[in-house]
A protein has these predicted regions:
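Flexible, non-catalytic linker and terminal segments flanking ANL/adenylate-forming cores
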Residues: 1-18
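Active-site-adjacent beta-strand anchor residues
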Residues: 13, 77, 123-126
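A short N-terminal helical cap/helix-turn-helix that marks the beginning
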Residues: 14-35
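Aromatic/hydrophobic pocket-lining residues that form π-stacking "cages" and hydrophobic walls in ligand
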Residues: 23, 87, 133
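Conserved AMP-binding/adenylate-forming core of the ANL superfamily
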Residues: 35-89, 106-111, 159
Length: 159
């Protein structure tokens, strides 16, 4: 690298105010074109830009209704799946901060991350991961809510 640094040519990059704004602008333009795919019972199924944008808006609205404000932190711990991207975009679209957490974390790891990040809500997939995140959240006083991506998830009873 030379002593003088050239300014990067930004003409080829998206220069929107933020990622969420760029997403919604693209969703309006690309509407019914496919965006996210996943395997369901051995078959690939997809969601188009409009469907994903609707899911992002609905989750963002639920977060706001739960009292989340800009700069609040939301933990996301889930496998690589369309709902992860939807949760990520929903959190960013309301100005909150995503706190990503590994699916391999122990309950104690999740407690540490929740306590030190100040996360108020956790979003997770289902099954054992949801149980582990729920147990961790039950140990963190400031945690308000747990949202699961899988609607039929059974969580531990905290009485």
């Amino acid at each position: 690298m030379s002593a003088t640094t050239k300014k990067a040519d930004m003409s080829r990059y998206v220069t929107k105010a933020n990622l969420a704004g760029a997403f919604f602008e693209n969703a309006a333009a690309l509407d019914k074109k496919p965006l996210l795919f996943h395997k369901n019972k051995g078959k690939w199924t997809g969601r188009n830009w409009d469907e994903v944008a609707d899911s992002v808006r609905r989750l963002a609205g639920a977060l706001v209704a739960a009292g989340i404000k800009p700069r609040d932190r939301i933990l996301i711990s889930a496998e690589n799946r369309p709902e992860w991207a939807i949760a990520d975009l929903a959190v960013m679209s309301i100005g909150a901060i995503v706190v990503p957490a590994y699916t391999t974390n122990t309950e104690d790891d999740h407690v540490y991350i929740m306590e030190h990040s100040g996360a108020l809500i956790a979003i997770t997939s289902g099954g054992l991961l949801a149980s582990r995140v729920a147990l961790a959240a039950s140990r963190v006083q400031h945690m308000r809510m747990l949202i699961t991506m899988d609607p039929d998830t059974e969580l531990p009873d905290f009485g």
